[in-house]
């Protein structure tokens, strides 16, 4: 075993013939080094294990860039990383216990969609940072999208383009991001000297099955046969996808007759809209990287850091 260890960590000190035999055996046996044991032996060295709790982040396609950025950043700085899924709200305590058994040096709690979480008691006092979520404890550092400013600036873009009759189809009221986005829109509308009475605003019901409710809503706002709105502001790109189908089927020209604004910049989808969808980029990659750097760099202090969300102006506005 000493010879194997020397080959793994200082191959130049081993005779070539011996090194080749050991490497061949490693490949044949699919040997994997015990990193946790190596860490225990490396007393006095900088900690190097980053653990990730993933609540719907790894099991849905919408925010997986958070995880990719965390892993890439950890690798860039020579840290190891591993992930444990949280399968439901009630599963967080189990996942936390499983994670702590590995004695990580830092923990990142991630969620799909901006959420308010209840941190398992076992994680209090640990070196932890939140990514795409917030908690009641102000001492917990968190990195989240700046939904308010993003919607404010996108509304300024629509106003500058001359749109004055918006129809808004927001995500469910229970969604944390919805409040920030609606507030941003309404503030921009008021700051432009406009009356909110001009605006038609609706919230999607909770559940993915309700995206198609937008079809009925749009049909109700064609009087007679023409839309009573000049821009549709969608809670996300999936809602915009439904809207495109309804509008184009009615012969509506986008954006000449009605403009459409999305949110999220769903991976691999924005440019597939015809015409390409104007939307807002959720900065999941930056959120993941900053959360990882918070631990790797030993940043101090707990506060909410809001990450800018770029407006991607394409052809639908």
Per-region residue spans from a language model:
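Alpha-helical recognition/docking segments in bacterial nutrient-uptake
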Residues: 45-156, 223
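Flexible loop/turn connectors
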Residues: 219-317
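Short beta-strand segments enriched in small/hydrophobic residues
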Residues: 3-6, 41-58, 165-172
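N-terminal helix-turn-helix DNA-binding module of bacterial transcription factors
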Residues: 1-45
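Hydrophobic alpha-helical segments within soluble ligand-binding/sensing domains
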Residues: 141-168, 210-222, 282-300
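Short, solvent-exposed amphipathic alpha-helices that sit
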Residues: 21, 61-76, 150-154, 176-196, ...
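An alpha-beta-alpha
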Residues: 154-193, 303-316
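Short beta-strand elements in bilobed, periplasmic/extracellular small-molecule ligand-binding domains
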Residues: 74-86, 186-214
């Amino acid at each position: 075993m000493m010879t194997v260890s020397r080959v793994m960590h200082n191959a130049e000190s081993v005779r070539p013939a011996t090194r080749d035999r050991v490497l061949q055996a490693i490949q044949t046996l699919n040997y994997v080094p015990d990193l946790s044991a190596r860490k225990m032996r490396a007393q006095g060295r900088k900690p190097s294990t980053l653990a990730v709790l993933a609540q719907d982040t790894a099991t849905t396609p919408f925010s997986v860039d958070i995880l990719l950025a965390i892993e890439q950043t950890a690798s860039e700085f020579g840290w190891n990383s591993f992930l444990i899924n949280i399968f439901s709200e009630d599963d967080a305590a189990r996942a936390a216990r499983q994670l702590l058994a590995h004695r990580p040096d830092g923990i990142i709690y991630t969620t799909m969609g901006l959420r308010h979480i209840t941190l398992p008691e076992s994680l209090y006092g640990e070196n932890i940072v939140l990514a795409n979520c917030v908690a009641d404890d102000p001492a917990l550092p968190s990195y989240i999208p700046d939904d308010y400013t993003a919607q404010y600036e996108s509304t300024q873009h629509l106003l500058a383009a001359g749109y004055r009759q918006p129809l808004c189809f927001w995500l469910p009221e229970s969604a944390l991001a919805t409040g920030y986005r609606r507030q941003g829109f309404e503030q921009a509308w008021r700051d432009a000297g406009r009356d909110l009475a001009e605006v038609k605003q609706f919230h999607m019901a909770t559940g993915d099955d309700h995206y198609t409710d937008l079809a009925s809503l749009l049909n109700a706002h064609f009087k007679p046969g023409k839309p009573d709105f000049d821009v549709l502001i969608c809670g996300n790109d999936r809602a915009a996808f439904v809207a495109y189908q309804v509008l184009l089927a009615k012969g509506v020209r986008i954006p000449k007759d009605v403009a459409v604004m999305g949110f999220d910049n769903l991976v691999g989808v924005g440019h597939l809209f015809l015409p390409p969808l104007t939307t807002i980029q959720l900065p999941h990659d930056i959120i993941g990287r900053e959360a990882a750097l918070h631990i790797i760099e030993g940043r101090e202090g707990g506060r909410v850091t809001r990450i800018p969300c770029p407006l991607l102006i394409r052809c639908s506005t």
